[in-house]
Amino acid sequence: MKFHILAVGNKMPDWVRKGYTEYCQRMPKEAELLLVEIKPEKRVGSKNTRQLLQAESERIRTVLPPGCHIVVLDETGKQATTMKLAEMMDRWMGSGQDVAFIIGGADGLHQDIKQMAHEKLALSAMTLPHGLARVLLAEQLYRAFSINRNHPYHRA
């Protein structure tokens, strides 16, 4: 199965690419981690936030893998411990269905994307830079996989 990270934003600093790549390479083929960067809508002219989010929403829909389990990352989502994430991962992998995590841009996500999600998670109660959210999600997915496989990476 595959874990897709669909992230609005395509010009991340080098530390984001390096951090994400580190954990992506650690994931085994049976739980492949794939990143799709979505170009944010340009904030020019008279476009309001709703119009910007709508344009980004359409871009997200075009790259969303068909039939996947959709998890939106949002600061108002459910907070889960690492152990709970490991349980969720075990359930997702048991279903055989790919999972798509969606990270919004500077203005968040359009309500339509939030409504189509099967689950809504928060990485933190704090607002995080979007690049850091990618790295943190990749690390936590690797950690959850390690827990489920009794790998020594996670030491509780």
UniProtKB/Swiss-Prot annotation:
- Keywords assigned by UniProt? Cytoplasm, Methyltransferase, rRNA processing, S-adenosyl-L-methionine, Transferase
Could you give the subunit structure recorded for this chain?
Answer: Homodimer.
Localization:
Cytoplasm
Signal peptide residues are none
User: Which reaction(s) does the protein catalyse, per the Swiss-Prot or TrEMBL entry?
Assistant: pseudouridine(1915) in 23S rRNA + S-adenosyl-L-methionine = N(3)-methylpseudouridine(1915) in 23S rRNA + S-adenosyl-L-homocysteine + H(+)
Alphabetized Gene3D superfamilies for the sequence: 3.40.1280.10
Please name the gene that encodes this protein.
Answer: rlmH
GO terms for MF: rRNA (pseudouridine-N3-)-methyltransferase activity
Check the record and name the CDD domains matching this protein. Answer: RlmH-like
**Which cellular component terms (GO) are annotated to the entry?**
cytoplasm
Q: What is its main location?
A: cytoplasm
Q: Which domain of life is it from?
A: Bacteria
Which EC class is this protein assigned? transferase
Q: Does the keyword Transferase apply?
A: yes
Cystine crosslinks? none
Q: According to the UniProt entry, what is the EC number of this protein? A: 2.1.1.177
Give the family from UniProt: Belongs to the RNA methyltransferase RlmH family.
Function, as annotated, reads: Specifically methylates the pseudouridine at position 1915 (m3Psi1915) in 23S rRNA.
Give the classification, highest ranks.
Bacteria, Pseudomonadati, Pseudomonadota, Betaproteobacteria, Nitrosomonadales
Give the protein's recorded name. Ribosomal RNA large subunit methyltransferase H
* UniProt binding sites for S-adenosyl-L-methionine: 73, 104, 123-128
